[in-house]
Regions:
Chain B
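Thiamine diphosphate
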Residues: 1-169, 173, 308, ...
Length: 386, 326
């Protein structure tokens, strides 16, 4: 024990440098499940083996490249004023594609607002994700078509929806599973704690997939927790595992295993994907104000796409033609996204009164009629002006 | 026999039993709703008859109760959740307001959220802090929610059926101090629409509008005023969102005077909304400004002071006199 820590122990109530939240706890050296190293080497893990064909590996690579391309296009569209806001997933492609490709069609996904890669895996047209960021709707897709729920902006709320949905799955006697996505910041929310309690108590078939991207806007993970996040699960009575979130193979293997556990009726699992948000939280913030340049540089060396490319090239699972073709496909996606967003019409004014209620509502009827009359008064005065 | 005299508590219990019996997708969730039957025994015996999978005792976490109910509704269930007391709904307020109320609209109508949130509300039972509040305006203000409150056993029975059948989320405020009041319930009747206000006493000099626990007080006030030769009409609003303004308007245009009575604080309360709308609709029919009687802009007081805070017969009659004096 050091002199400093002894002194701190004598004055437990005094704030000292040792107890400051700015000091990194032991979580900075995570025990990660890893199957593909940052250098692109395949490694084995005793609990999570995976055997993918060259075609499957290329498909994962394609997913990640196209997702990144889509994300880059959306960021550019925000800069051009076509979107009001964008939450970039840059750097988190492996966590999202790996977990997303572990899902079956009949599984149900509850995302936060950054799961563009998971949406891609579910078959949601990426342009559908842009309506809410452009300001033409608050969701815009039917969650039941792809079993992909609407984005949830209030942090952590969706973990409870996922838990309730999973309770319903169990009641139905179905063997599908549910996955809830959230971030390291959300782990501080009461709803996440309550969802852990409920899912454990009812043994709900839900996987909690926490993308620890190290930052909740400007607050580091150390501002959310003093223990590694995956260890929280133990206190609730279910397993937690930390996976290299930049390793698409490990994310796939770990999520698949957790989903299978849920299907077998063994209850929830917390997966902490240890990753990094390369860009800003959203296009509204400026990460240069709160994090050091060398931090990003260190994570760039762990880039999820580069490492799989290295492996594909070294193993001979993909040739140059594959990468060239993907580049063309990627540009075409960018072009389509651009065109669709720019052509998105503003909603009709009268749509204000649509969908507030499933059943009729006299108050809405009254206000709709007043608004319609008000709108019509402009048409009348235009008529008079002729 | 279809007509039976029962308490509001019994009517709610019978109604929940009927809902569980008719639709296998109906669930009841909450703290202590199982073996205990709820702290007010509204769910008494239901777990015994329908099992722990249908009548679900939950962890002690209100946001979790409503949040998981939302998930169950998305899976096709129709959860009825019990919040133990009015003041305990606030941990769940976020889930109700930011999630439950808005999800149907956010999905452009593609999904439905048939969740009923039962809240025993209001004062007059000598309870401790957070057990006597009337937060209905906080919910009525939120688009996407329906807010209702029965005042008698028949409405308790039928409005609960209608709330469960609604594809929209319904906040169902139960007047806890009237739980043991008895009246006739016809379980074979064809109920009126959920959001229709009802004239519970005819009159020609002034209209009293109330809902939930205050209907009884207003009926007593009208009876007392009758002895002084004043003819008071009493409306039971039944629904605070939406509000049946047509019925209120028709009554006011007959009597020319309106007093709104509720337990909740007057400031920003439902009385303010009714006064404003009726003034817009019936300005030239009004013989007096619309008056309001309700709680004060003060924390709900300790039990020994609640008689001063809650509108009673005298305060309602005082408002009637003030209105008639114009």
């Amino acid at each position: 024990m050091t002199v400093e820590s002894t002194a701190a122990a004598r004055k437990p109530r005094r704030a000292s440098k040792r107890t400051s939240a700015a000091k990194k706890p032991q979580s900075s050296e995570p025990q990660l499940v890893q199957l593909l190293t940052p250098e692109g080497e395949r490694v084995e893990h005793p609990d999570y083996s995976i055997d993918l064909s060259a075609e499957e590996l290329r498909a994962l690579y394609r997913d990640m490249v196209l997702t990144r391309r889509f994300d880059a296009e959306a960021t550019a569209l925000q800069r051009q004023g076509e979107l009001g806001l964008w939450a970039s997933l840059l750097g988190q492609e492996a966590a999202q594609i790996g977990s997303g490709r572990a899902l079956r069609d009949d599984d149900y996904v509850f995302p936060t607002y950054r799961e563009h890669g998971v949406a891609w895996c579910r078959g949601v047209d990426p342009t559908n994700l842009l309506g809410m960021f452009r300001g033409v709707n608050h969701g815009g897709w039917d969650p039941t078509t792809n079993n992909f729920h609407l984005y949830t902006i209030v942090i952590g709320s969706q973990t409870l929806h996922a838990t309730g949905y999973a309770m319903g799955v169990a009641k139905d006697g179905a063997d599908s599973a549910v996955i809830a996505y959230f971030g390291d910041g959300a782990s501080s929310q009461g709803d996440v704690a309550e969802s852990f309690t409920f899912s454990a108590v009812y043994n709900a078939p839900v996987v909690f997939f926490c993308q620890n991207n190290q930052w909740a806007i400007s607050e580091p993970t150390e501002r959310q927790t003093r223990v590694p996040l995956y260890q929280r699960a133990q206190g609730y009575g279910f397993p937690g595992v930390r996976v290299d979130g930049n390793d698409v193979l490990a994310c796939l293997a770990v999520t698949r295993s957790a989903l299978e556990r849920a299907r077998r009726g063994e209850g929830p699992t917390l997966v902490e994907a240890f990753t990094y948000r390369m860009g800003a939280h959203t296009t509204s913030d400026d990460p240069t104000k709160y994090r050091a340049d060398d931090e990003r540089a260190a994570w760039e060396a762990k880039d999820p796409i580069l490492r799989l490319r290295t492996y594909l090239e070294k193993s001979g699972h993909a040739d140059e033609a594959f990468f060239t073709e993907l580049e063309t496909e990627s540009e075409a996606l960018g072009k389509r996204v651009r065109e669709v967003v720019r052509a998105m019409p503003d909603p009709e004014p009268m749509s204000l009164f649509e969908h507030g209620y499933a059943d009729g509502n006299s108050l809405v009827d009254e206000e709709r009629a007043q608004f319609a009359a008000y709108q019509a008064s402009f048409a009348d005065s235009a008529e008079e002006g002729k | 026999m279809a007509v039976e005299k029962m308490s509001i508590a019994k009517a709610l219990n019978e109604s929940l039993r009927h809902a569980l019996d008719t639709d296998p997708k109906v669930l009841i969730m909450g703290e202590d709703v199982g073996k205990l039957g709820g702290v007010f025994r509204i769910t008494d015996g239901l777990q015994k008859d329908f099992g722990e999978d249908r009548v679900i005792d939950t962890p002690l976490a209100e946001s979790g109760i409503v949040g998981t109910a939302i998930g169950l509704a998305l899976r096709g269930y129709r959860p009825i959740v019990e919040i133990q007391f009015d003041g305990f709904v606030f941990p769940a307020y976020d889930q109700i307001v930011t999630q439950l109320a808005k999800m149907h609209a956010r999905a452009l109508g593609k999904i439905k959220l048939p969740v009923v949130v039962r809240i025993p509300y209001g004062g007059g039972i000598g309870a401790v802090e957070h057990h006597s509040e009337s937060p209905e305006a906080l919910f009525a203000h939120v688009a996407g929610l329906k807010v209702v409150s029965p005042s008698n056993a028949s409405d308790a029975y039928w409005m609960m059926q209608q709330a469960v059948q609604s594809d929209d989320p319904v906040i169902f405020f139960e007047p806890k101090r009237r739980y043991w009041d008895k009246s006739e319930v016809d379980t074979d009747a064809i109920p009126g629409p959920l959001h229709k206000a009802v004239t519970v006493r005819e009159g020609s000099d002034l209209t009293l509008v109330a809902y939930g626990p205050m209907v009884k007080v207003c009926l007593e006030a009208a009876a007392a005023a009758q002895e002084e030769g004043k003819s008071i009409e009493v409306l039971d609003l039944r629904s605070m969102s939406p509000i049946d303004f047509d019925t209120v308007q028709a009554s006011v245009e007959k009597t020319g005077r309106l007093v709104v009575v509720h337990e909740a604080p007057v400031f920003y309360g439902s009385g303010a909304e009714i006064a404003a709308r009726i003034t817009e609709r019936s300005f030239y029919h009004l013989e007096a400004p619309v008056l309001r009687v309700g709680g004060y802009h003060a924390p709900y007081p300790p039990a020994r002071l609640e008689e001063e805070y809650l509108p009673g017969l005298d305060r309602v009659l005082d408002a009637v006199d003030r209105s008639l004096a114009y």
